[in-house]
């Protein structure tokens, strides 16, 4: 429901017309990733999607490919070492 609300009420886009970038926490189980992919393709008919680890994208945003990212969120914090991206 959150993705439906985001696509149609917040972004006001047709998801079948836009590739999607999803982020995930480190060590997200493969089953979760597969379910996200299934929902995006089968429910929203997105043309393409990519799933990336949040910490890696944070490091890229700082212009680096190697570093340690401390990702502190609402209910959990992760320290993620990344070597050459």
UniProtKB/Swiss-Prot annotation:
A GO CC annotation given for this chain: cytoplasm
Localization per record: Cytoplasm, Cytoskeleton
Listed name of the protein: Actin
Catalytic activity: ATP + H2O = ADP + phosphate + H(+)
Function: Actins are highly conserved proteins that are involved in various types of cell motility and are ubiquitously expressed in all eukaryotic cells.
Keyword Aminoacyl-tRNA synthetase: no
Main EC class the enzyme belongs to: hydrolase
GO molecular function: ATP binding; hydrolase activity
Record-stated family: Belongs to the actin family.
